[in-house]
Design a protein with these regions (language model features):
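N-terminal periplasmic/intermembrane-space "pro-region" immediately following the signal or transit peptide
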Residues: 21-217, 447, 451, 463
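Bacterial N-terminal signal peptides
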Residues: 8-18
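Short loop/turn motifs that connect adjacent beta-strands in outer-membrane beta-barrel proteins
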Residues: 122-157, 168-172, 208-221, 266-276, ...
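Outer membrane beta-barrel
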Residues: 200, 204-324, 409, 442-491, ...
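C-terminal structural cap/anchor segments
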Residues: 455-458, 462-571
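Extracytoplasmic loops and strand-loop junctions of Gram-negative outer membrane beta-barrel proteins
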Residues: 140-143, 179-192, 241-246, 283-285, ...
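Outer-membrane beta-barrel "beta-signal"
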Residues: 578, 616-630
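Signature for the C-terminal beta-barrel architecture of outer-membrane proteins
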Residues: 272-274, 283-469, 528-530, 537-540, ...
Length: 630
């Protein structure tokens, strides 16, 4: 084998030498290179050795600046968007043509560029475009894109117009002891039709000091004044006001400072932008992923920050609740006296990448008080049973998770409530509180469709007379769950004998007079909910949200004693809803929401709201909401 290899190598060498000899031209035609240059001369540089960094412009094109003359002025291009006046003071002037001082590095100009040669049509995407103060889509000093003072102080001005038209049908009692809206009304429950118009105007001024996007801000001052105008039209008396002479229409307006706070970073906890900050004033806060327990904007002192390269987040907050306006649900300047303490801790990538766990502790102290709302209805204490002012002291222990495990999305929440109620109006005695709540949602994304299923349970009270309140209730919830604002059961406040069977934007049938002004009630029937639904991104601009909820009371013993009806069943009914979100500009600057829903009554709902002929028409509701943001 080794001998054959040597023979082959020798053959290849012979062939290569012969070929080279045939390809070599005669000696007379070969150039003879000069190995050494003549004496006193440099060796010539071949062209292929030239490098771009060593190129020199022709001497004829170079015109030196005269010494002592004015420095060379370079052309100035305007910066992009709307920059406003610079807040950086110049520290020097240009002294020569080689150095041009640029103090405000944020407002560097760029030349105009018509990328496609079309003359910049309105709907085409062009780089290096100039803007105006009223254009939030381009760089704008009013949107925090350029500093207004120095290099690090920015102002973000945000305007929001929220318009809501809500047409709904809810069981509505008549006024059997006073005049009715129409003659010869015999039914206890009259016309269910109601029409609501709500208009909000928000203006947020956010002044903050900071650097880049990933670094937490050093300090912030924020103020949000709000104007609200609302109108309610109903078909029955004593809905807008207990005084039937006030009619069936109510017009209200309200102005307030909804948000106002100052924020300061107290310390950096690591080189990886971990920090701890303090925020004092009226501010938004949501206690968990979906808003099951507490979701509000109110007066607070909040300590918050991150740890372990932003993998962990924490909050410590104390809320001193301000009284709410009845019709706009905005904060008033009146103190309510309710104290809420919250602490939670988040851990990202817990066991599974993309899955976040949360543990929380909450304490609610709601002292005894006596309160009529702006429409002259009694809201504290609840106007049922022996309505005596009472004090609530309740603690909540929570454990939650949100994220995805592989291709499956999961959200879950558990709360255990414990504490004491000095005198529950329904039970007519003091109560020791021990109640639970659990929720879970599973979903799977398939192309442009998300398929969902979820379950919700809040425990009910099985014995109203035993002194132990086991019906779970929240503090001020606003759950984004099982359809959320598109669901009939969550969106509508269904009243029942002076209180609400379920409050607006809540899941729990807690028999409270008002979610925003009443007190938590742990003597309630509780809820079992099973949901199936799907969300579909029909186009990049249009999204559809569909849900079907099956509803049961967890326990009907409280309702049986409250209504003096032993025949109440646990089946509430089936809630069917469909919602649409339309974004005409593919952004959240303009969003139109539309929703329609209906509740197909079950035997339990029928026994509470049936008519003389033992029938209940399925209530239907629809709404249109338009959000325009600058």
């Amino acid at each position: 084998m080794r001998r054959q290899g040597g023979t082959c190598l020798a053959a290849w060498l012979v062939l290569f030498t012969a070929a080279a000899g045939r390809a070599q031209p005669p000696a007379s035609t070969l150039p003879v290179p000069e190995l050494r240059p003549p004496a006193g001369e440099e060796a010539p540089r071949m062209p292929f050795l030239d490098r771009p960094l060593e190129s020199v412009p022709p001497a004829a094109d170079f015109v030196p600046m005269p010494e002592g003359g004015p420095p060379l002025r370079y052309p100035f291009d305007p910066p992009l968007g709307f920059t406003g006046p610079s807040g950086v003071l110049p520290r020097g002037e240009q002294g020569d043509s080689d150095f041009v001082p640029v103090e405000d590095r944020w407002r560097l100009g760029l030349p105009a560029w018509d990328r496609y040669g079309k003359g910049h049509p309105l709907l085409d995407d062009y780089p290096y475009a100039l803007g105006a103060w009223y254009n939030p889509f381009k760089q704008n000093v009013l949107k925090g894109d350029y500093p207004i003072i120095g290099q690090h102080t920015f102002l973000n001005v945000t305007g929001l117009s929220l318009s809501l038209v809500d047409q709904r049908q809810v069981p509505t009692g008549t006024t059997p002891f006073e005049s009715t809206a129409r003659a010869h009304q015999e039914e206890f429950f009259g016309s269910p039709n109601q029409l609501v118009y709500n208009q909000f105007l928000f203006l947020t001024l956010d002044l903050f000091h900071g650097d880049a996007s990933f670094k937490p801000i050093d300090w912030r001052v924020l103020v949000t004044p709000v104007i609200n105008v609302n109108t309610l039209n109903v078909d029955e008396l004593a809905i807008t006001n207990p005084n039937v002479t006030k009619g069936t229409q109510r017009d209200r307006d309200f102005f307030t400072l909804q948000e106002y706070f100052v924020e300061a970073k107290l310390a950096d906890l690591s080189p990886y932008y971990d920090f701890v900050s303090l925020r004092v004033g009226s501010q938004p806060f949501i206690s968990d992923f979906r808003g099951f327990l507490f979701s509000d904007v109110n007066r607070a002192v909040r300590l918050f920050g991150t740890a372990f390269s932003n993998r962990d987040q924490f909050n410590l907050a104390f809320f001193r609740q301000a009284e709410k306006d009845t019709n706009s649900q905005l904060n008033s300047l009146q103190d309510r006296g309710q104290d809420i303490f919250l602490a939670n801790y988040y851990r990202q990538d817990f066991i599974f990448p993309g899955y976040t766990m949360q543990a929380s502790l909450t304490y609610n102290h709601d002292p005894a008080s006596f309160k009529f709302d702006r429409n002259n209805f009694l809201v504290r204490p609840d106007p049922v049973g022996t309505f005596t002012p009472h004090t609530l002291d309740v603690g909540y222990v929570g454990l939650a998770g949100d994220g995805h495990i592989g291709r499956y999305n999961i959200t879950h929440q558990f709360y255990y409530a414990f504490g004491h109620d000095s005198h529950n109006p329904l039970a007519n005695q003091a109560q020791s509180i021990s109640a639970e709540m659990a929720a879970v949602e599973l979903s799977y994304d398939r192309d442009w469709v998300r398929f969902r299923t979820s379950f919700f349970w809040s425990s009910g009270d099985h014995n109203i007379n035993d002194g132990h309140a086991t019906g779970f209730d929240s503090i001020l919830d606003n759950p984004n769950f099982a359809g959320g604002q598109f669901s009939y059961w969550q969106r509508q406040a269904v009243s029942l004998f002076g209180v609400n069977l379920v409050n607006r934007l809540s899941l729990i049938p807690d028999l409270r007079s008002s979610k925003i002004q009443g007190q938590s009630n742990f003597v309630n029937p509780g809820l079992l909910l099973y949901n199936i639904g799907f969300d579909a991104d029909i186009t990049p601009k249009l999204k559809m949200i569909n849900n079907c909820n099956f509803l049961w009371f967890d326990s009907v013993e409280v309702l049986k004693q409250f209504t003096f009806d032993r025949g109440i069943d646990s089946r509430i009914g089936t809630d069917i809803s469909s919602g649409y979100q339309y974004r005409p500009f593919l952004s959240n600057n303009a969003v139109v929401l539309f929703g329609i829903s209906a509740l197909i009554p079950g035997s339990g709902f029928k026994s509470l709201f049936d008519r003389k002929d033992n029938t209940v028409n399925p209530p239907v509701a629809a709404f249109v909401q338009m959000n325009f943001v600058f």
